[in-house]
Amino acid sequence: MQISIVAKTIGLLLMVFSFAQVPPLIIDLIYAEGEYLSFVYSFSLTALGGLVLWWPFKEVKKDFRLREGVLIVVCFWIVLSLFGTLPFLITDSISDLSFSEAFFESMSGLTTTGATVLSQLDEVPKSILFYRQQLQWLGGMGII
């Protein structure tokens, strides 16, 4: 098992996923909802997490086999869902959301389940709603 190639790949994918925070950030700035810091912090933490995983192994030039490929897919679903919780946890507009509920919301979006634990969706900022829908779109792209 070549853990170095797994860490390098997950780090690279996390850095790419960090850019998923940019469209909701722009939506927040357009509607002036005041939630932009949650997306800035999420972008920064996700990009930094990816960089920490990728940097030590950036020179590794090995190809991964089936075993590493399966581990990358499994780890990526979990890691991506964990980092996907950040905007839900950092936002001020959804103050009563626990970590498990935020993780459920993120995993539900990325697996295109469509289930939600958020109540009163009409009161949730448009940027958070856009982020939820974007997670579902990204999950759909991952399934295709």
Describe the role of every protein-language-model region.
Residues 1-144:
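Membrane-proximal intracellular helices of multi-pass ion channels
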